[in-house]
Swiss-Prot record:
Species whose genome carries this gene: Staphylococcus saprophyticus subsp. saprophyticus (strain ATCC 15305 / DSM 20229 / NCIMB 8711 / NCTC 7292 / S-41)
Pfam families associated with the record: Ribosomal_L32p (PF01783)
Family annotation (HAMAP family): Ribosomal_bL32
Gene3D superfamilies in the record: Single helix bin
NCBIfam families associated with the record: rpmF_bact
Bilayer-crossing regions: none
InterPro entries: Ribosomal_bL32, Ribosomal_bL32_bact, Ribosomal_zn-bd
Protein name (database record): Large ribosomal subunit protein bL32
Length: 57
């Protein structure tokens, strides 16, 4: 079995993980009510998607 010869230091470990991060979700403004919502999803505030009322409130 493969076993590491030396312990991985904190610096080396953190340098390897520099690209391992969470990206910010794409938020857009709803054209109906002006609230911020996730792209390509129904607005939680007014229930519209692409200018049409999808969810009745």
């Amino acid at each position: 079995m493969a076993v590491p010869k030396r312990r991985t230091s904190k610096t080396r470990k953190n340098k390897r993980r520099t690209h391992f991060k969470i990206s910010v979700p794409g938020m857009t403004e709803c054209p109906n009510c002006g609230e911020y919502k996730l792209s390509h999803r129904v607005c939680k505030n007014c229930g519209s998607y692409k200018g049409e009322d999808v969810v009745s409130k």
